[in-house]
Amino acid sequence: MMIENDTFILSKRGWLPLTLVAVFFLFFTMTTLHLFQFICGALLIALLLIYRNPERTTSINEPNAILSSVDGVVLSIEESLIDDKMMKKVTILNGLWDVSMLRAPFSGIVNGYKIRHGVSLPLYSPLSETLNEKAVLSFRSVCGDEILIEHMSDQSCFSIEIEAQTEQKMKEGCRYGFLAKGRTILYLPNSAVMSIHPGSNVRAGESVVAQFA
């Protein structure tokens, strides 16, 4: 089942808050309440940045490529034992001013996903792992390779949104959700050949993170 993709310049999920803030901005402009006009103007610009939804394409035409699902900076690359299987763990931090749209890492199928609704504590808090809002998705490529992706919010008033269904087919770079600020972890097969390193800047739907062996 294919879900209608959000391809507008500004994400549809941002239309309501943007409209409300724009109305208040115009009202305070007409009433010459300059302080409130400035506050609403700044908030309007911030929301435009957060909900921007650019088109992304990759020039890499390789069936084994794994693209980043999120914009941000690579924090670390390490090995981790998941369900008695050693996997590569790639941690990416995305800030509030990074593009918030989440994109499929390759063409394939969503094996499944789950969302834990919660709070949005700082990631350095020891309680964040158990209390913060989190989404975990499993993707399977057309060649049968599988990866896990975990998204967790970080000091954000915006909820994580996932627009996917189990067994849904997705094309490479297809939008599947929204994360305004947080941490994303990609769990890749241990045999995957990495194309990035800690400190690398990545762009969702464009940057190649690794290649399936």
List each model region and its residues.
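Contiguous, well-folded functional domains in the mature portion of proteins
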Residues: 1-213
